[in-house]
Amino acid sequence: MNQVRKWNIIGGRVIKTGIAVFLTVLVCEFFNIPTIFAVITAIVTIEPTATDSIKKGLVRFPASTIGSAYAMTFTFFLGHQALSYALAAMFTIVTCQKLRLHAGTLVATLTAVAMIPITADHYFTAFLIRLATTSTGIIVSTVVNFFILPPHYVKTISGCTEELFVKTANIMEEWLTALMDGKVIIKETTYNLSKLTVLLHKAVQFVQYEQKDWKYHRHTKKEMRSFLLVQKQLHLLQQIIYHIDNLARAPIETCDWSQNEKEILRRTIHSIISILRNHCEEIDEEHFKLIDELDKQFWTNKNDLAHCKPNQYHHHFSSKSIILFEVLSIHDMLEELKQIFEKYESENQLNCSVH
């Protein structure tokens, strides 16, 4: 399993930041303008996607313009006093928020307070120079983010998806152990489930990043199919994790299973674990037989509950029915995952035969 590298110190974004800073300084030195504000802007303009760099760059430029204008105005009237810093920061923040320039508020405020101590006269000229340095930082960073090491998250998403399959299977195994022992879910399982949810959200975020830049870069049909596959897999894994979370919250200790019921459930869960670890590429006939047995159990429990008197039971589902329902729901997701994988494989084979 190719897991996502957790300790990758120098990634593409770090390298691009260094390149952007280097080029920004060269441009500033060529035009003989101050470098510090251009460098600050260049650093914050490097975003996870080129799309975000462009969008936020268009926000940060007017925001920095506002900050520079306030800084020069208050310095002109009040000089280098504490009140000038405070008013420049306050007015910059309020104006940016009112104009919905949220992405540029921080940079604009830093620009405003940093300009005050280094400007003694020629305020309008200093203001124009600041616009030039800000523009330089934004343009250089956007160009670097767009053309140098453009973000490609498909491999990262695939790694996250593989890890999700394995970790989902592991949590199912932990839950099965608790079920067989008739004990409450331990804290470690709950913690692992929360970590699994974090990993899922991370993978979904990478999908969103990839979609944002999809229109700017060329992709082969195979890459597009791979991306659509992992996107659909993540959507279904999200539903599986939701059902597992419900299983973890089900009151296991109140269930009264017969030996036969317990054995069928155990074998079914083991089969689900095996399928997940195999990335749902194959589901054997034995698994479907177990699901049929489980389905019969579910409806038997549901019908038995329907005959209970109101004063004996007030819930529509017993603990056993809830557990069976969640397991059957997980099976439905596994079937969908298998169909998606089969479609992906058939399209790949068809494409290979054409070429």
UniProtKB/Swiss-Prot annotation:
Domain of life of the organism encoding this protein: Bacteria
Disulfide bonds: none
Keywords from the named record: Cell membrane, Membrane, Transmembrane, Transmembrane helix
Main location: membrane
One GO cellular component, as annotated: plasma membrane
One Pfam family cited in the UniProt record for this chain: ArAE_1
Transmembrane spans: 19-39, 74-94, 109-129, 131-151
Record keyword Membrane present: yes
Residues in coiled coil: none
InterPro entries in alphabetical order: ArAE_1
Membrane-protein topology: Multi-pass membrane protein
Cellular compartment(s): Cell membrane
UniProt KW Kinase keyword: no
Family: Belongs to the UPF0421 family.
PANTHER family with a match to the protein in the record: MULTIDRUG RESISTANCE PROTEIN MDTO, P-HYDROXYBENZOIC ACID EFFLUX PUMP SUBUNIT-RELATED
Protein name: UPF0421 protein BA_2743/GBAA_2743/BAS2557
Species whose genome carries this gene: Bacillus anthracis
Organism phylogeny: Bacteria, Bacillati, Bacillota, Bacilli, Bacillales
